[in-house]
Amino acid sequence: KKPRVGVVGEILVKFHPAANNHLVELLESEGAEAVVPDLTDFLLYCFYNTGFKADNLGMSQKSKKIGRLGINFFEWLRSAARDEFTKSRHFTAPAHIDDLARYARDIVSEGNQTGEGWFLTGEMLELIHTGTPNIVCTQPFACLPNHVVGKGVIKELRHRYPGSNIVAIDYDPGASEVNQLNRIKLMLSTANKNLAKQNAPEQKDQAAGLSLIHI
């Protein structure tokens, strides 16, 4: 098995290879499986936010209804793919935006809507719940929203999920690429150690089974 590493963060740095120094290629070259959540989820997050704004910040109920229609439409579009991913042993089906909101709600308020807002916390929790406890949280240097809902929640996530292995990486033209690489490789080293611990009982069981067959 390869260690699975999720990539989350500010939308440009998360998806654009030139902005994150080809992070996905780096992870794969180091023997990890990169897991990058859908771009569609960010659009659904924007639709979902209209509900909170209508209920708490004076936005019209019409906007809330339009947002919910948008969510239902996009979820319908990818429902066939989600069903097939659910049946597969090799792929993970994307979570519903309502599930992401429910995950995040225990840690940050849905009122955190600047930038990636609560959605970033929800994505990290989705990865942890689907077997990807190793996470790189990417952010532009001095990105205040990410410091609150990204780097700011890492301590709480580690407290609630002791097996989580999360590192926040700042990307900036003036930042040292060597420092970024060192932090990512340290995270991967921990990921490989944790994976070896998980595989140890399975290997013992297999060895015991082979011994019985030999006898």
Predicted regions located by residue number:
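A polyampholytic, Gly/Pro-enriched intrinsically disordered region
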Residues: 54-63, 185-196
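Acidic, low-complexity intrinsically disordered regions
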Residues: 192-197, 202, 210-211
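A charged, amphipathic alpha-helical module
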Residues: 1-99, 103-107, 111-112
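Hydrophobic alpha/beta core scaffold segments
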Residues: 16-32, 97-194
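Conserved small/polar residues in nucleotide/adenosyl-binding loops
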Residues: 213-215
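Short coil/turn segments at secondary-structure boundaries
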Residues: 2-3, 201-203
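Functionally engaged cysteine thiol sites
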Residues: 44-46, 143-144, 201
